Design a protein with these regions (language model features):
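Flavin-dependent oxidoreductase catalytic cores
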Residues: 1-310
Length: 310
């Protein structure tokens, strides 16, 4: 998740909770300059991702730029990269990036030809089921079946939905039937019961990509696997170490607080009756006020089946 699950989050999460089989970077946006920004470089440097499996995610509309970035990542030791065809942001799709590429299947095929022919690494893809209609998915599946995709992660909404409405599980059922690549489900797995419902309805599901649910409940992977539920003590340790890392890296008070407040948009969902302390967190202007508000929210019980509330 862009701006939340960065390298600090990944390192602290894997220390205190059941780690993900693979973490994905916030998307990197290679351009014709063929330079990674300092921020992008910090995200992917192997020394910043010790002890976890990391898959860099690329968002671009130029096959040569993708191939260049994949080559740079291969030189760092990465054997696999992820192509983001799922981002629905208007500023992204207007440039035919992310899910903006799905509406032009000729352009999509030309792009995929270029990256699969030119890249020396394995490529996984995250996609949506279409641009404006789920009826588009059958055609997209035919296209994806022509390439050696390492894994196809499907967010079961169309681009125009953004994150509104329910995921289209009939599209997931179709994907399980017709797609050749190994599949990964994505969409509204916000807590352990929602994962259980999906796996009960579609037991052939082999993988799930978590987003907002994991940001709200860092114990979610363990809970889905039958492990211990989220508890306040472990969550507080997670928060305190993450805060210390972010403070060391960011330094300045205002951007530090902005970063932590964004995280609390998700973490706050896992506490009962959290509206008042969350408001205090969001209104805090100093680190002292912020930490005082955080102490207050930790006096509230953690919700049973904690997770994101839409």
């Amino acid at each position: 998740m862009h701006g939340v699950t960065d390298r600090d989050f990944r390192q602290v999460h894997s220390k205190f909770f059941t780690p993900a089989d693979a973490y994905y970077t916030p998307f990197l946006s290679p351009t014709a300059t063929h330079r990674l920004t300092p921020k992008e470089l910090r995200e992917v440097l192997p020394e910043n991702n010790v002890g976890i499996t990391l898959e860099p995610q690329l968002l671009c509309a130029s096959a040569p730029d993708f191939v260049w970035a994949a080559g740079e990542l291969a030189a760092m030791g990465y054997g696999e990269v992820n192509l983001n065809l799922g981002c629905p942001s208007g500023t992204v799709t207007a440039k035919k990036k992310g899910s903006g590429m799905l509406e032009d299947t000729e352009l999509l095929r030309k792009f995929l030809d270029g990256i699969f022919e030119g890249s020396a690494v394995r490529i996984s893809i995250k996609t949506r089921i279409g641009s404006s209609s789920a009826d588009e998915f059958s055609r997209l599946a035919e296209i994806f079946n022509d390439y050696p995709i390492k894994e196809l992660c499907i967010h079961c909404r169309v681009r125009t939905q953004q994150y509104k409405g329910a995921p289209d599980l009939s599209a997931w059922e179709t994907a399980l039937r017709v797609c050749r690549a190994p599949l990964c489900y994505n969409g509204d797995i916000f807590d352990a019961p929602s994962a259980e419902r999906l796996l009960s309805a579609y037991p052939e599901t082999q993988a799930i990509m978590l987003g907002r649910g994991l940001a709200a409940n860092p114990a979610l992977i363990g809970e889905i696997s039958g492990g211990a539920a989220l508890d306040a003590e472990r969550l507080l340790c997670f928060h305190d170490e993450l805060f210390a890392l972010c403070k060391e890296r960011i330094g300045c008070e205002k951007p530090l607080l902005l970063h932590m407040k964004e995280l609390w948009t998700y973490l706050g969902c896992s506490f009962e009756e959290s509206a008042k302390p969350l408001k205090a967190i969001k209104k805090s202007q100093t680190v002292s006020d912020y930490l005082s508000a955080v102490s207050t929210i930790f006096t509230h019980p953690v919700r049973t089946n904690a997770g994101f509330i839409n």
